[in-house]
Amino acid sequence: MITPIATLMCANRDPDHLVARDASRQWRWGVFSNDVAQLAATLQRRPERRWLWANDCSYQFAVGLLALLHSGKTIVLPPNTQSGTLATWASQCDATLDATLLTSGNSGHAVDPRCFASLDTHTACIELATSGSTGAAKIVAKTLGNIDSELASHQQLGFIPAHCDLLFSTVSHQHIYGLLFRTLMPLARGIPYWSSSHAYPEHVFADIAHYSQHAALISSPAHLNRLPPALDLGHYATHLDCVFSSGGPLSADAAQQLGNQLGHYPIEILGSTETGGIAWRQQRDSHSRWRALPGVETRSDNDQQLLEVRS
């Protein structure tokens, strides 16, 4: 079951439901709903419309994102949290959300969901940067309707099992893939997620084995194509139920290494900021083909060497 982000804060979830955690702290729904409500109330008193938002902690990022949406702001996500990048992007916005405004509440009691109104899926908007792989990076606006539709499309395929108990990631939520899979999908599904990023495969697999029995890993070829040869993935097979990869081509060797040692092949997602998700595959062998995601139609123009996408 998936809850649209448009109605997420209206959901009557158990205050003790685990939202996110790291090695030293856990955040539950009662605290999360209070944090979002308090920040949204602060932001509603501010006149600025376009807000820059970047934060490396996925819990704080989610609080800021939901609070900005529920205060009627347009969110601009820069491609990273580096100071130079933030300074450049801040000049295109009315204000920057300061992490010091995010003071986690002490109350464990969830805010009455009736305090939140459903978000307008046509006007609520998040702006993201493209990768710049085909030229200079540009801003692409995604309505909440676009985002909820894409989450529902991925949910139809059922890749993340219902019994998943913790989601880990090696990718940033500042980009569309990480935004959807690292932050919004677990919130919509009610799956707890690890709040910090892992820079090294050894660290993420160690935490998976220590903290989870049925984990999901959101990753990319930048990490999966470079797994250390000495890393025994079979040691983690009973703790890791699924691996996702996006952001570039995953090598056949990496796919086979993961599949042979974990007992399941990584799920590759093809897409871009502009198009959203297009297709998926699992490289079980050299004949594995891409399959269109639910609701996506594709057509190839061989003469122009173009792929036309409609969703």
Q: What residue ranges belong to the model's regions?
A:
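Conserved AMP-binding A3 loop
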Residues: 28-29, 125-152
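Conserved AMP-binding/adenylate-forming
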Residues: 41-81, 164-173
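Gly/Ser/Thr-rich phosphate-binding loop
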Residues: 229-287, 297-299
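Flexible, low-complexity linker/hinge segments
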Residues: 100-124, 141, 149-151
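AMP-binding/adenylate-forming
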Residues: 91-101, 141-157, 162-226, 267
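AMP-binding/adenylate-forming core of the ANL superfamily
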Residues: 297-311
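Conserved AMP-binding/adenylate-forming core of the ANL superfamily
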Residues: 14-45, 142-145
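Conserved pre-ATP/AMP-binding loop-to-beta segment of ANL
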Residues: 3, 9-15, 111-129, 160-167
